[in-house]
From Swiss-Prot:
Similarity comment: family membership: Belongs to the polypeptide deformylase family.
Residues the entry annotates as binding Fe cation: 104, 146, 150
Listed name of the protein: Peptide deformylase 2
Record-listed E.C. numbers: 3.5.1.88
Keywords: Hydrolase, Iron, Metal-binding, Protein biosynthesis
Reactions accelerated catalytically: N-terminal N-formyl-L-methionyl-[peptide] + H2O = N-terminal L-methionyl-[peptide] + formate
Species: Streptomyces coelicolor (strain ATCC BAA-471 / A3(2) / M145)
GO biological process: co-translational protein modification; translation
Name of the top EC class for this enzyme: hydrolase
Protein biosynthesis in keyword set: yes
Source taxonomy: Bacteria, Bacillati, Actinomycetota, Actinomycetes, Kitasatosporales
Active site: 147
Lineage: superkingdom: Bacteria
GO MF annotation: an example: metal ion binding
Length: 179
């Protein structure tokens, strides 16, 4: 039997920022107030992520330039990882670099082969201010690195070069959501 509420059950679905929105391309500020507004933001992030069928979502993707992300993401063994991190730090990456398909709720409908390590460790805090360490492998490691990138003002397209980058940018230009 499940203990506690389902993440996002009390949150509201917020509009998603899209590639080109300034908040997506600037480093986010550290969270200093671990109060009810932060808890409400985490609930909103979960609600928005689930509504968009995502596996992770950073606060700046809903217009909040603070260092918070949520996730509900499987690893390569299909083990589910569910949680959030406030003021995350990507403290370790390792294993091998794998080029795999990567998408983003801020570039809807698009994906590109993006290189990421297959192991990652993130430290940070919960909404209650308790320290947390999250370890990921495979797809979940990719998710952790992707969300940490968002909070630094980067999207996966920024990691692409050459032909892959040009191809993705052509797809962005043709996308119905592109301004």
């Amino acid at each position: 039997m499940r203990q506690g509420s389902i993440p996002g059950a009390h949150g509201r679905v917020r509009p998603l920022g899209l590639l080109g929105d300034p908040v997506l391309h600037a480093r986010c500020a550290e969270v200093t107030d671990f109060g009810p507004e932060l808890a409400a933001l985490v609930e909103d992030l979960f609600a928005t992520m689930y509504a968009a069928h995502g596996v992770g979502l950073a606060a700046n993707q809903v217009g909040e330039a603070v260092r918070v992300f949520v996730y509900d993401c499987p690893d390569d063994e299909d083990e589910r990882h569910l949680g959030h991190v406030v003021n995350p730090r990507l403290v370790e990456t390792g294993g091998v670099v794998v080029r795999g398909p990567e998408g983003c709720l801020s570039l809807p409908g698009l994906e590109a082969g993006t290189e990421r390590y297959d192991e990652a460790v993130v430290t940070g805090f919960t909404v209650a201010g308790e320290p947390v360490t999250v370890r990921g492998t495979g797809f979940f490691a990719r998710c952790l690195q992707h969300e940490c990138d968002h909070l630094e003002g980067r999207v996966y397209a920024d990691r692409l070069t050459g032909r892959r980058h040009r191809k993705l940018m052509r797809q962005v230009a043709r996308a119905s959501w592109h301004r």
